Amino acid sequence: HGTFTVPDAMLGPMYLVFCEVIDPAEPVSDLLLKYHSELMFQENSTFSQPYYSRHNWLQAKKGMVKPFLSTYYHTMAPYADPGTYTFWEHLYKLSPHKTHEEANFLMETRWMLYMEDADTLNLFRVIPRRWMADGDRIELSGVQSYFGPLNVRAVSNVRNNRIEASVRCDPAR
């Protein structure tokens, strides 16, 4: 279906980490990530149907900013159709307007902005650092999280070595 690496690169052992059968902190998770990155990807993205691959989830969990962003942009840029704002299923422009790809693009954007890890909520862990240039801000309003609706406002004041943030979520969750 477009590439012979599909079973290994997209539907293989990385799903054991994604489904938390293997803990992301275990050494074998790093081994799988390195193996996949070296043998199954080009520019940190799979050759076909890249939104099936879950190495980006592990990169986000581990706070690997540059690899995560490489995957994010090398996946989004060639698959997004600027005329329709939808995504192709394959790099060679077969099967347009795929809701699976569109939903996963949105989920990866969510992971970039906020991502739960057990009882911890990580905010802006793998965003491009330039998004927090002095005077810039990021706001999330009413986004859904495992902790209930979430409101976040972060304002950069890096000139004075600080970023100020306010976070509101349901304290009972």
Q: What is each stretch, according to the model?
A:
Residues G2-D117:
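Active-site core of glycosidic bond-cleaving carbohydrate-active enzymes
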Residues L16-C19, P128, R173:
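Proline-rich low-complexity regions
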Residues D30, L69, P82, E89, ...:
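General "foldedness" signal
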Residues N44, N56, N104, N122, ...:
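Detector for Asparagine
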Residues P78, R130-M132, N160-N161:
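Flexible loop/turn segments at secondary-structure boundaries
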Residues P96-N151:
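Catalytic cores of secreted or luminal carbohydrate-active enzymes
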Residues V143-R173:
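Carbohydrate-binding surface patches
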